[in-house]
Every structure is written in C-alpha cells, then in structure tokens.
C-alpha cells in the first residue's frame, strides 16, 4: 500500500498548477519567465493575485491530500511523511513537465498541515513574518522550513527524518536564491 500511495503522491505532485494555469490564462510560462520558478510567488509576478492564489491552493492540496490518504489507509506517521515527500518530489521534478518544477514550499506546507498542524502554523507564521519584514519570499521559505524541526523532534519524532530530508530538498532548490541573497541581487516585492 505504501508504494502505491507514494507513486500516486508523486503523480499528483507532478501536476503543476502554475504551468497549467499559465497556459489556460495565456500568461507566460513561469519556468521561462520572471524568476523561472513554477510556483505561486512567480505567478503573482507574472499573472496576478488571482492565479497566484489558485496556484498556492493547488500546491497546498498536492501536499495535503496524499498524506490524508495515507493516514486513511492506516499508514503510520513516518510512512505518511514519506508519502508527502513523494508529492513534494513530484512538484520539484514533475513527470508531466520535463522534470522542471517549482521549489516545493507550498506543497511542503500542505504536507505539514496534514502531518502535524502546529508545525505548519509555525512555518506559515514564520514565513509571513519574515516576508513582511524583508519582502523576500525565498528568505521567508529558507527561515520558515527549518524552524519546524525542533517542534517535530519534540512532538512527533517519527516525522523528524523525513522532514529533515524535506528541509534539505527545499534549501537545495533555493541554492540560486541563497547565492543572490548573499550577493544582494535577490528579488523583493
């Protein structure tokens, strides 16, 4: 059951709402325009608030639904977390879009919502505060994601390893943003 759910999670994660919505609306492809990222922040820049919100909600659901399905199937929290990771991998490397996807932040947030809601609230709160103070989405993601680790280690230790892997994946996907942050070239809103 785990492997079937992991495959389904990857396939669902591979559905890129940013790419689909940009095609349907006639907006530029987010992979080749703006920041080059197929995610909600770039959709906000390229296509406006409405499509950015739809992208965000779709990406959140891609992380949330597979974990809830894994829970309904009776998988333990550790296995649920790995199923969620498969959804994030689908978002990062989508089968349907030549393996060029987004950075996984919203999909990871959806996954966290299903795994341990207080960790998701912590991450979302940290993201919002950092973004409010800096107007920099990438910095907000880089600060918010690892903040969940101590809370999970304390309250849900069986999810710590998969969430640590998730944190590394998200930081790795933001490596160009890190370079731009240190060079003072990162985009702000």
UniProtKB/Swiss-Prot annotation:
Recorded topology in the membrane: Multi-pass membrane protein
Name of the featured protein: Glycerol-3-phosphate acyltransferase
Catalytic activity reported: an acyl phosphate + sn-glycerol 3-phosphate = a 1-acyl-sn-glycero-3-phosphate + phosphate
Record function comment: Catalyzes the transfer of an acyl group from acyl-phosphate (acyl-PO(4)) to glycerol-3-phosphate (G3P) to form lysophosphatidic acid (LPA). This enzyme utilizes acyl-phosphate as fatty acyl donor, but not acyl-CoA or acyl-ACP.
The EC number(s) this enzyme carries: 2.3.1.275
Pathway: Lipid metabolism; phospholipid metabolism
Record GO biological process: phospholipid biosynthetic process
Subcellular localization(s) per the UniProt record: Cell inner membrane
Gene Ontology molecular functions: acyl-phosphate glycerol-3-phosphate acyltransferase activity
NCBIfam families attached to this UniProt entry: glycerol-3-phosphate 1-O-acyltransferase PlsY
């Amino acid at each position: 059951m785990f492997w079937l759910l992991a495959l389904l999670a990857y396939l669902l994660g591979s559905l890129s709402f940013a790419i689909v919505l940009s095609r349907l609306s006639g907006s530029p492809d987010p992979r080749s325009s703006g920041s080059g990222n197929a995610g909600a922040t770039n959709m906000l820049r390229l296509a406006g608030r409405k499509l950015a919100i739809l992208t965000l909600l779709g990406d959140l659901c891609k992380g949330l639904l597979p974990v809830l399905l894994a829970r309904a199937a009776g998988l333990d929290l550790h296995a649920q977390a790995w199923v969620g990771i498969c959804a994030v991998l689908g978002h990062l490397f989508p089968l349907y879009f030549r393996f060029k996807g987004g950075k996984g932040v919203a999909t990871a947030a959806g996954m966290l919502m299903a795994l341990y809601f207080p960790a998701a609230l912590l991450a979302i709160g940290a993201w919002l505060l950092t973004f409010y103070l800096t107007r920099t989405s990438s910095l907000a993601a880089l600060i918010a994601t690892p903040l969940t680790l101590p809370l999970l280690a304390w309250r849900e230790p069986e999810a710590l390893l998969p969430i640590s892997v998730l944190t590394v994946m998200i930081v790795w996907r933001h490596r160009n943003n890190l370079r731009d942050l240190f060079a003072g070239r990162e985009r702000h809103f």
